[in-house]
Amino acid sequence: MARFRTVAAVGLALAATSPTTAFAQGSLFTTVPVELNNFVLVSAPIGKGERSQLNIYEQRTNKRPCFAVGTGVPAVVDPLLSTFDFTGICNRYIDGNGYSLRIGGDDLGTRYRLSVVNTGRDIELLATPTRNPSQPTMVVARAGGAASGFIQLKLEPGWTLRRRAYGKKSLGHLYVYRDSTPVESAPAQTDPIDSAPIDSAPVDSALTPSY
């Protein structure tokens, strides 16, 4: 028994120091492309509308529309999926369980949060560092002007959406993604609106869990 404990302890020590066993978050999951036209990023009001958070709606089938985007800038979004049982038709990603930030092979979900900030002149989706404040804050998307209600957020150049994958299996989690860190970053915001979980389910559909 003593020999077993010694061997086990040595094994644990090697596992803790071996780079082959210490998987980075970005190396565990990969990404697959999505049809961006099937998605809309939305600044969605919380409560009485004094704050907002990021929602992402996905049109999975053509059975009936999941959302409607108005004309003009900023564009108002009608979340049609909230008026019917959209199981199998739409997906709705409402918090950090359903989406996260990724740059290249680096999964930044635990190091950055995606926050909707109303600057008074625009509505911005910011990627804000949560662990190291010296890291840059990045502007991911903008509404294009001041507005209230459900407002479309348009991705900045270089940003897109991709789906998380594990091996050959696509998962029910989206990445707000770009290939490399942008050269210019946004100044730090004094009071970002946190996109903390509000509802109970991150993806309202019968998708495979996102892990």
Regions of interest found by a model, annotated:
Residues 1-8:
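Bacterial N-terminal signal peptides that target proteins for export
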Residues 10, 37-39, 50-53, 111, ...:
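Short, surface-exposed beta-edge/turn micro-motifs
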Residues 10-12, 205:
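Intrinsic-disorder/low-complexity peptide segments enriched for small residues
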Residues 23-81, 145-187, 207-209:
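Extracellular/luminal recognition modules and glycoprotein regions
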Residues 58-124:
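Structured domain cores in non-transmembrane regions
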Residues 98-194, 199, 203-211:
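Low-complexity intrinsically disordered segments
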